[in-house]
Amino acid sequence: MEDGRFRADLPFFGGKAILKPNGKEGNANSAIIEKLAEVGGLLARGKIKHSYPHSWRSKAPVIYRNTPQWFAAVDKPVNDGLDAYGKTIRERALTSIDELVTWTPPTGRNRLHSMIEARPDWVLSRQRAWGVPLTCFTKNGSLPADDDYLLRNSVVNARVLEAFEVEGADAWYMDGAKERFLSGIVEPEGYTQVFDILDVWFDSGSTHAFVLRDRDDGSDDGMADLYLEGTDQHRGWFHSSMLQSCGTQGRAPYRGVLTHGFTLDEKGMKMSKSIGNTVSPDDVTKQYGADILRLWVAQSDYTSDLRIGPEILKGVADSYRRLRNTMGFMLGSLADFS
């Protein structure tokens, strides 16, 4: 439970504390060990020193708990008639990666393909104080596997949409929201309002819909010519956009993906103000002039991580002087040339 105890109805260990409020070990572990010994199921006991996860806020030990969540099934047929690239989200994504999208550099294809090929279902829900709500209702007494567990009603959806367009997502959290959206359609007392929020990557992954498709100045087919971001977005924006578009449009939301590396210091370390290894473009141009910075960019391979620092800039400045002196000599030698 939320207080660090087993549920009261759990046989043998109901109500026992795994962790106490002060973060100290409760009586649950010792009770489990004693029960295992009692039934002859304990192979060995002892103490070992090992790392253990702690909260970054409170610094107290944490407990991993299984909690009910909402998922998007990547291997379940979507049944929307958009089967040109496959019947499931995974099939559509993998086919789009191979047949529809151009990857720059080509290695980007392998990264996203391997991730989607091996990924589990997408966990859509989060339990947070604020965010984009899932905006759904579940029927009391039904189980998740039942057809009527999730309320599917176009009139209810229209009411929610209208409220959000005027009041924003806060409309979902107002007092009486359930009665407002359900009254006159179904009995509000028969349903539970879900207050889970969406994964933020679902939020960012929907940009193809409201930037490209649902605007007068969007693209004709709702697809982007190019998505451009850093290499970390194979796991992020490229990934979530692909899954969501394959679930709603039947194919990728983009025709091309260009991936760039990151700018690091000259030792290959991530820049950090606390470490003091940042390089300001303004400082570079003040010391060397803009052409040195332009030349560093021009001679760098953007498809991999870029390094910059005092010694590297000195080398670029030397190259620039050689180029300038050589070109000056060549231009001077052209006098009276015909």
Task: List where the protein language model places each region.
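Alpha-helical recognition segments enriched in aromatics with Gly/Pro capping
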Residues: M1-G4, R128-W130, L151-D305
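Conserved nucleotide- and phosphate/pyrophosphate-binding catalytic cores
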Residues: A335-S338
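Residue patterns forming the tRNA-binding/recognition surfaces of aminoacyl-tRNA synthetases
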Residues: M1-P144, Y149, M269, I275-S319, ...
